[in-house]
């Protein structure tokens, strides 16, 4: 008996939709990262993108536990001297809630070339509507 290894041409990518309303950010991000990697499938192969597409709606209604809204700080740097910028989770949630979820999921993906392909399969929307109804996404229970 031989071990079956997934190939890029034979992988079937499904679409899932997740409602992020009143869901804790870290718990959502871990499960979404596993679906993006394909670890929920029996044909999971670390070197092949076996993951599925994930659409997250209601990103502005995500929950953070404890004092993370005020205490959690996100940093970015322009590359120039003195070019560091910081924003709290509360400020990021009010301005760009999609980016808050995207950064959380990105931190839980592997740090390699394949992670960029996996992150492209993540679609995050702040409202309840999304333009991916044609793909007939299935509801992903958390």
Curated annotation (Swiss-Prot):
Keywords: Ribonucleoprotein, Ribosomal protein. Pfam families: Ribosomal_L13. One of its GO terms (cellular component) is cytosolic large ribosomal subunit. One of its GO terms (biological process) is negative regulation of translation. SUPFAM superfamilies: Ribosomal protein L13. Gene3D superfamilies: Ribosomal protein L13 (3.90.1180.10). InterPro entries: Ribosomal_uL13, Ribosomal_uL13_bac-type, Ribosomal_uL13_sf. It comes from the Bacteria. The keyword Ion transport does not apply. The keyword Transmembrane helix does not apply. Transmembrane segments: none annotated. One of its GO terms (molecular function) is mRNA binding. Belongs to the universal ribosomal protein uL13 family. Part of the 50S ribosomal subunit. This protein is one of the early assembly proteins of the 50S ribosomal subunit, although it is not seen to bind rRNA by itself. It is important during the early stages of 50S assembly. HAMAP family: Ribosomal_uL13. This is Large ribosomal subunit protein uL13. It comes from Trichlorobacter lovleyi (strain ATCC BAA-1151 / DSM 17278 / SZ). The lineage of its organism: Bacteria, Pseudomonadati, Thermodesulfobacteriota, Desulfuromonadia, Geobacterales.
């Amino acid at each position: 008996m031989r071990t079956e290894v997934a190939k890029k041409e034979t992988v079937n990518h499904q679409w899932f939709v997740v409602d992020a309303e009143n869901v804790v950010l870290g718990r959502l991000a871990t499960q979404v990262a596993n679906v993006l990697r394909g670890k929920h499938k029996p044909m999971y192969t670390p070197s092949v993108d076996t993951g599925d597409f994930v659409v997250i709606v209601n990103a502005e209604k995500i929950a953070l536990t404890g004092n993370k809204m005020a205490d959690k700080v996100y940093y970015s740097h322009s590359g120039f001297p003195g070019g560091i910028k910081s924003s709290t989770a509360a400020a990021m949630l009010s301005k760009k809630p999609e980016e808050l979820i995207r950064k959380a999921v990105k931190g839980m993906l592997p740090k390699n070339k394949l992670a960029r392909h996996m992150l492209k399969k993540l679609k995050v929307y702040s409202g309840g509507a999304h333009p991916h109804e044609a793909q007939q996404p299935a509801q992903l229970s958390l």
